[in-house]
């Protein structure tokens, strides 16, 4: 495990059930400080007042997509280096390329397992 479980993690997804699943997996992995937002725009507002150490976001959301959120984070000097993991049903190669060009840290296609998320986080923080 190459990550600090005391870090603050932001989980962004428009489906409460998916946020709960990701939070449960993070809790199983030992994370204790998890905040959430139900879309990219809400996440941007939250990030104005809170520093996070990791962002895990869905792609398809109302108001602001996960890709737009990623681009916003990377354009902000204060957040540009925050690891960003995209967890999405978007498995098309074109979307993966867009995310990589926007400097996503890791890309996970739904459905996924707790083991997959843990492995991706190990890669992000190794």
Question: What is each model feature region?
Answer:
Residues 36-54:
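Acidic, metal-coordinating helix/loop segments flanking the phosphotransfer/catalytic sites
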Residues 23, 68, 91-106:
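Alpha4 helix (beta4-alpha4-beta5 surface) of REC/receiver domains from two-component response regulators
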Residues 39-42, 65-71:
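Acidic catalytic/metal-coordinating carboxylates
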């Amino acid at each position: 495990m190459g990550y600090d479980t005391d870090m603050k993690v932001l989980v962004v997804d428009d489906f409460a059930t998916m946020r709960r699943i990701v939070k449960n997996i993070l809790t199983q992995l030992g994370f204790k400080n998890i905040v959430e937002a139900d879309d990219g725009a809400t996440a941007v507002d939250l990030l104005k007042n809170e520093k996070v150490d990791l962002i895990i976001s869905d792609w398809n959301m109302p108001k602001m997509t996960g890709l737009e959120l990623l681009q916003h984070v990377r354009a902000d000097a204060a957040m540009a280096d925050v690891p960003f993991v995209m967890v999405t049903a978007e498995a098309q190669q074109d979307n993966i390329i867009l995310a990589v060009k926007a400097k996503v840290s890791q890309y996970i296609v739904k459905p996924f397992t707790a083991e997959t998320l843990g492995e991706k986080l190990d890669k992000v923080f190794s």
